[in-house]
Design a protein with these regions (language model features):
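Key DNA-contact positions within bacterial/archaeal DNA-binding proteins
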Residues: 36, 46, 65
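Short amphipathic recognition helices of helix-turn-helix/homeodomain-type DNA-binding modules
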Residues: 66-83
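Short intrinsically disordered terminal tails
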Residues: 1-2, 82-85
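Short alpha-helical DNA-recognition segment
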Residues: 22-40
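A short, Lys/Arg-rich alpha-helix, primarily the initiator
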Residues: 1-22, 65-69
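DNA major-groove recognition helix of helix-turn-helix/homeodomain DNA-binding modules
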Residues: 50-69
Length: 85
């Protein structure tokens, strides 16, 4: 059964960064994005794009398909909530 209210993938990534002891600035540099772009993702203001999913995969954080599935599940749940309102 699908989760009715999955967390934003940025929350998962934020937990991963904390567990690895990495800062937002350091991680943004490794990902090749701005600190602001990563911060928006971590705070649920932006989603994980295919390019970001691949960048995360290259750094060893699971695979790109995993990140895209998290984003798709989140987006679908959000749309279901909007349509139910």
């Amino acid at each position: 059964m699908a989760m009715l209210n999955p967390c934003h993938p940025g929350e998962t990534l934020r937990d991963d960064l904390a567990a690895a002891g990495l800062t937002v600035t350091e991680t943004a540099a490794r990902l090749g994005c701005t600190r602001q772009a990563l911060s928006r993702l971590l705070n649920g203001k932006a989603g994980i794009s295919p390019a970001m999913a691949i960048a995360l995969e290259r750094l060893g954080w699971s695979n790109a398909a995993y990140w895209m599935r998290l984003q798709a599940a989140y987006d679908l749940a959000q749309e279901r909530r909007r349509q139910a309102a």
